């Protein structure tokens, strides 16, 4: 078996040998062909690269040649331009030198001519002219020397043009200065010296004038401010007397009986003072049964307010004492309706001279008019005494410290408690006008005011207070509203009726008349 197997293997090998030989030959031939193709490709690639290199070298050479040609053309052009420029420069130099020589000749001749006619300056003109004539000979000789020098430069060789130009540059300022005669320089310098002090004096005077004019203008404005004339109606729009009283700041206008002094009433429409932000407008009036009177402004305290509790721990008399310490305060009551102003004042205790006091019997004099009093400010001792007198004398006028918890036995007490309200009230005038604030000053001594019944729009009223006050506007009262106290008669308001006068009231009025007065005032408003 083994021999048989070995024989089969040998037979297969011998049979398969001729079949393998041609395949090997084919493979050899294919390899040779591939090698040849690769060699051809390499040769082609090499030729291609060589062609590219040759082409690149040729193109670079051509570019270099073109650039060289351009450079040559540019250099030639620049050389041509330079030659033309040099030629032009040379010709321009020649022209400039010629013109300069001619101008020098003309300048020298002009200088000689000008020296014959020198300028005179003021009073020293004759002296300057004599100096110029005495120096004329020297100037003529100098001008002739200049002409000789310029002629020598012109007749010189061409090679000396540059040197001549430099010398001309150096000589031009000297020639110009030398052409002008010295006498003229002296005259001009002297005239400038004369003009300078004049200008300096004017410059010194001008700020003085401006300061003086500024001060004069300030004084004029101040005098105008002091001498403003304010027109005040002599009555409150309805008594039939339409004349206007004009006054300055220090004049005294007519007075309506014995009542309180009033501030400016500009007629219709606008308020006199600029203090417009903190002013209250009182529009409603409460009856005796209501707790408080209405007001529109919530920024500052109202007109008829009674402080519940002061920050200092004191009552309204203390606040009156504080407001009385303001040196320029004014007590003003402005009524523009049929409201009633009344009260009683002890005229013997009022500050000021006796000649300026108002008697208690002269209540019916000057009805419906307004008077301004300007007394000297009372001293601090008088103020303290006045505040203590007010605390002692107004026993029925006292206001409790805690206003919310207080009650009154009758309407009479509520009527009597309006004394401190009357001095801190402001009243809006007709239209959009608002009354000025009323700080208490002298009324804190013994003001005892009451409100009486309101009989109608045509009821005649008389002012019963007389006093002298300083006129200083724009004061604000510091009172706050007492919500627990009835405001039946302390409220003030506007009445649209034509007849507006003031009447005095008495202390012993009944509570019924006060109720009717407060209701009629609230209805009229």
UniProtKB/Swiss-Prot annotation:
Q: Name one Pfam family in it.
A: Osteoregulin
Protein name as annotated: Matrix extracellular phosphoglycoprotein
Give the location of motif Cell attachment site in residue numbers.
247-249
Q: Where is this region: Disordered?
A: 24-95, 187-216, 237-525
Keywords noted in UniProt: Biomineralization, Extracellular matrix, Glycoprotein, Phosphoprotein, Proteoglycan, Secreted, Signal
Which lineage do the record's taxonomy fields give for this organism? Eukaryota, Metazoa, Chordata, Craniata, Vertebrata
User: What's this protein's function?
Assistant: Promotes renal phosphate excretion and inhibits intestinal phosphate absorption. Promotes bone mineralization by osteoblasts and cartilage mineralization by chondrocytes. Regulates the mineralization of the extracellular matrix of the craniofacial complex, such as teeth, bone and cartilage. Promotes dental pulp stem cell proliferation and differentiation.
**What processes does the entry annotate via GO biological process terms?**
biomineral tissue development; skeletal system development
Q: What is its main location?
A: secreted
Expression sites by tissue: Detected in urine (at protein level). Expressed by osteoblasts. Expressed by stem cells in dental pulp. Expressed by mesenchymal cells in dental papilla and dental pulp. Expressed in teeth, specifically in decidious dentin. Expressed in ondotoblasts. Expressed in salivary glands. Secreted from oncogenic hypophosphatemic tumors.
- PANTHER family assigned: EXTRACELLULAR MATRIX PHOSPHOGLYCOPROTEIN WITH ASARM MOTIF, MATRIX EXTRACELLULAR PHOSPHOGLYCOPROTEIN
Entry's free-text remark on domains: The acidic serine aspartate-rich MEPE-associated (ASARM) motif is sufficient when phosphorylated to inhibit bone mineralization by osteoblasts and cartilage mineralization by chondrocytes by binding hydroxyapatite crystals during the mineralization stage. It can also inhibit dentin mineralization.
The domain of life is: Eukaryota
List all annotated glycosylation positions.
256, 477-478
Where do the record's region annotations for ASARM motif lie?
507-525
InterPro entries, per database record: MEPE
Q: Per the record, where are the segments of Low complexity compositional bias?
A: 513-525
Record's Gene Ontology CC terms?
A: endoplasmic reticulum lumen; extracellular matrix; extracellular region
Compositionally skewed regions (Basic and acidic residues) per UniProt: 25-46, 64-73, 292-312, 319-328
User: According to its UniProt record, where is this protein located?
Assistant: Secreted, Extracellular space, Extracellular matrix; Secreted
């Amino acid at each position: 078996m083994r021999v048989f197997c070995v024989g089969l293997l040998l037979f297969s090998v011998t049979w398969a040998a001729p079949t393998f030989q041609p395949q090997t030959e084919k493979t050899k031939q294919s390899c040779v062909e591939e090698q040849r193709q690769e060699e051809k490709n390499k040769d082609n690639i090499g030729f291609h690269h060589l062609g590219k290199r040759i082409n690149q070298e040729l193109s670079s050479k051509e570019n270099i040649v073109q650039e060289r040609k351009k450079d040559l053309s540019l250099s030639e052009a620049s050389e041509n331009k330079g030659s033309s420029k040099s030629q032009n420069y040379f010709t321009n130099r020649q022209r400039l030198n010629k013109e300069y020589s001619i101008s020098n000749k003309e300048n020298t001749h002009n200088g000689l001519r000008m020296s014959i006619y020198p300028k005179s300056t003021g009073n020293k003109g004759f002296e300057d002219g004599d100096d110029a004539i005495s120096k004329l000979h020297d100037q003529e000789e100098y001008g002739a020397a200049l002409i000789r020098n310029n002629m020598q430069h012109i007749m010189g060789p061409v090679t000396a043009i540059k040197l001549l130009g430099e010398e001309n540059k150096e000589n031009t300022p000297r020639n110009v200065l030398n052409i002008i005669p010295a006498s003229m320089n002296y005259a001009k310098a002297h005239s400038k010296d004369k003009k300078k002090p004049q200008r300096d004096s004017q410059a010194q005077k001008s700020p003085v004038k401006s300061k003086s004019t500024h001060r004069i203008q300030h004084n004029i404005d101040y005098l105008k401010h002091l001498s403003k004339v304010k027109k005040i109606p002599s009555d409150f729009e309805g008594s039939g007397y339409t004349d206007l009283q004009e006054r300055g700041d220090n004049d005294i206008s007519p007075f309506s009986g014995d009542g309180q002094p009033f501030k400016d009433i500009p007629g219709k429409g606008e308020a006199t003072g600029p203090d417009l932000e903190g002013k209250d407008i009182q529009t409603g009036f409460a009856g005796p049964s209501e707790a408080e009177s209405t007001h529109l402004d919530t920024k500052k305290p109202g007109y008829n307010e009674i402080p519940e509790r002061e920050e200092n721990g004191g009552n309204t008399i203390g606040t009156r004492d504080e407001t009385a310490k303001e040196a320029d305060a004014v007590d003003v009551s402005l009524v523009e309706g049929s409201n009633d102003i009344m009260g009683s004042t002890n005229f013997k205790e009022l500050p000021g001279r006796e000649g300026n006091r108002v008697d208690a019997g002269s209540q019916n004099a000057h009805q419906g008019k307004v008077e301004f009093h300007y007394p000297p400010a009372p001293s601090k001792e008088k103020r303290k005494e006045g505040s203590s007198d007010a605390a002692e004398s107004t026993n029925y006028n006292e206001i409790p410290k805690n206003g919310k918890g207080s009650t009154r036995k009758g309407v009479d007490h509520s009527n009597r408690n309006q004394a401190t309200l009357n001095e801190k009230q402001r009243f809006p005038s007709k239209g959009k006008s608002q009354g000025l604030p009323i700080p208490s000053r002298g009324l804190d001594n013994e003001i005892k005011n009451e409100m009486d019944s309101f009989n109608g729009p045509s009821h005649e009223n008389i002012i019963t207070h007389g006093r002298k006050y300083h006129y200083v506007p724009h004061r604000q009262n510091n009172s706050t509203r007492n919500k627990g106290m009835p405001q039946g008669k302390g409220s003030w308001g506007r009445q649209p009726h034509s007849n507006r006068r003031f009447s005095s009231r008495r202390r012993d009025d009944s509570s019924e008349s006060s109720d009717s007065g407060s209701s009629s005032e609230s209805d009229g408003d």
